[in-house]
């Protein structure tokens, strides 16, 4: 499903971010990606989301060749992805319900499908009682649950979680990973980037270790930790797997009609999409176009640093 073949990335300023990376991730896998700051994790994610293109090598995701992809195809490719950010990226003047519904509205879902799907997903993440609350009325853990619900709501084939536990307490961190694992049990591919090594040791999953832009370890967890001889500097060691405090919410299919997906000629209006794309105080919807005139909201965000 996801193939990196001899992928290297060198930025315009000469920074070498990735060097000859070869990774294959099958459909339905749950993979942790770990590494110190500057190891190449952010570049790895940007390449998967087609925010960047490789300097050399090929990246294939679901038969899309990302390096050769035309810009107009990017929005349709990104509909296969559900993104969970460390900093939540919630829209402050929208309720929990509307933040989650917004992700469906952007891709053209029908309102009757939204009314069925959104409450179901909000219930999965345990926030039904907070559906009408605003982000500033939620704890950090609750905000991250909203971000997770937003990533789930469009039934993405691939969930990419970028440090999803970075701003929450240990108990909530465990619950977030459990939610991702329950989702993974339904066949969704999950890739979680994290520096929370203690958390990784609790699960028997594949771990990819990046260091200096290279893959230095890639394998299944052994006895609760990846092979120590391959990543001893990360202090990943065997630890008894805990099963306490596991949430039991099952990801079962809710009775609903299949949402109608818009054809390419029905892509959302570019001006509207640019108005909601932001790197700072609102979350980025991974839909864009190559022809657009900035709206007032987009102009207000002008000058923000790229992620």
For the regions a language model picked out, list residue spans one by one.
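Short coil-to-helix segment of the ABC ATPase nucleotide-binding domain corresponding to the Q-loop/switch region
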Residues: 94-102
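Conserved ABC transporter NBD signature motif
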Residues: 57-65
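A short, proline-enriched helix->beta-strand linker immediately N-terminal to the Walker B motif
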Residues: 153-157
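Conserved ABC ATPase signature
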Residues: 134-138, 142
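Conserved beta-strand-loop-alpha-helix hinge in the C-terminal portion
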Residues: 201-202, 214-244, 248
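Catalytic Walker B motif of ABC-type/P-loop ATPase nucleotide-binding domains
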Residues: 159-162
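Helix-to-loop junction immediately C-terminal to a conserved catalytic motif
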Residues: 49
